């Protein structure tokens, strides 16, 4: 925008606001307003005709290109999964020769159709789209003139408001008289300019509308016959398609069902089609803990063999001798979940502070539920570290209470069995059907015996129900209070 245009826009801004809010005196011409409305419709419909014609031509060409790509994809699907050609001498062919041949024939027909329809599609571009674009250029020039007329209308209304303001003064001064004459001259000039553009548009817009009707009529007829020719060519070529692989005489749904057979049932029988990512991650984590923790660095056996937590002056004889004190180390600690509360308070055969600290350090890396693996506690490393009881303790009854910090490897296997708690059970909240091998199925309300579980209910637990052992999601059950 030039500086002159900018100054005019600034001077017209107040009148634009008045016109928008219907304030002050405004010039109206119903005849031009009706012509302006029809002109806007003409502009919109011409744009729509041009865009839709171009979209139709592009869509037909794109459809044929898509069908060629579809035929190529079907050829790849019919080939074996290795991507290599099958052995023609094989008893059972790995690929589908009939399907590949049908795809190649269909691709050839569509490619030929695309070449045949190229002149018709080019004709749509030449006879419909190009004339519409030329008409839009003419409409753009007329739109500029209509904008010019609207600007002159704003100037006329602005000068009329100024003239009326000075004319209504009851006691005008000399300067007011001078401003009145100046405003009157501006009104006369603005009126002449506005009348010129307004009369020009009112006179010539109806002529444009009549010419537009004569212009659109042949375009519509041409576009109709072009589409008819394109559809007729498509219908005839596809109707005469001689591909034995396709049965065009039978019902399409029946043919599809007959060729599909029991493929859907065979696919549903595959395990990978029912794969659940969340369950598989939890199972993988549980498998790692179950089978990989025995050799891990934090297991009780590895901790004892490495000697972590033992002092330099460790004495095995002292570690195995019972202490005559009351409850020994850890008696004030809260009762461990693995100990029966009714037997608490009897004398405990716990070693010295050094031995207790050592056993606690070794048991810190233990995994609950895995201590039956340490039945061979009479091995030399464990005996030397004080984990074997004295002969007097082995001959007499096992102690009624075992220190939680030294469980599960602080005593002999007999002591571990005696300290085992009651069977922990859970009640099923929902029905669960096994999703894979190793899962445990159960109905809602079933009481399941816990073999191994974790504190997190969102992980998989191991249980036993109806003589079967397997894993199940922890959030499907509720722990029973003993």
Swiss-Prot record:
Q: Where in the cell is it found?
A: Cytoplasm, Cytoskeleton
User: Gene Ontology cellular component?
Assistant: actin cortical patch; actin cytoskeleton; cellular bud tip; cytoplasm; cytosol; mating projection tip; medial cortex; Rvs161p-Rvs167p complex
Which SUPFAM superfamilies does this entry report, sorted A to Z? BAR/IMD domain-like, SH3-domain
GO MF, one term, reads: cytoskeletal protein binding
The SH3 domain covers: 421-482
Q: Which domain of life is it from?
A: Eukaryota
> Which part of the chain is the BAR domain?
17-254
Gene3D superfamilies in the record, alphabetically? Arfaptin homology (AH) domain/BAR domain (1.20.1270.60), SH3 Domains (2.30.30.40)
Residues recorded as bearing Phosphoserine in the entry: 299, 321, 379
Where does this protein chiefly localize? cytoplasm
Q: Which UniProt keywords apply?
A: Acetylation, Actin-binding, Coiled coil, Cytoplasm, Cytoskeleton, Isopeptide bond, Phosphoprotein, SH3 domain, Ubl conjugation
The entry's comment on post-translational modification says:
Phosphorylated redundantly by cyclin-dependent kinase PHO85 in association with PCL1,2-type cyclins or by MAP kinase FUS3. Phosphorylation inhibits interaction with complexes involved in actin cytoskeleton function.
A Pfam family (short name) is: SH3_1
Coiled coil ranges: 31-64, 174-204
Query: Where would I find the Glycyl lysine isopeptide (Lys-Gly) (interchain with G-Cter in ubiquitin) crosslink on this chain?
Result: 242, 481
Q: Which InterPro entries match?
A: AH/BAR_dom_sf (IPR027267), BAR_dom (IPR004148), BIN3/RVS161-like (IPR046982), SH3-like_dom_sf (IPR036028), SH3_domain (IPR001452)
The region called Disordered is annotated at: 382-407
Additional information? Present with 14600 molecules/cell in log phase SD medium.
Q: How does it assemble?
A: Binds to actin. Interacts with ABP1, GYL1, GYP5, PCL2 and YBR108W.
Q: Output this protein's name.
A: Reduced viability upon starvation protein 167
Q: Which organism is it from?
A: Saccharomyces cerevisiae (strain ATCC 204508 / S288c)
Q: What is the lineage of its organism?
A: Eukaryota, Fungi, Dikarya, Ascomycota, Saccharomycotina
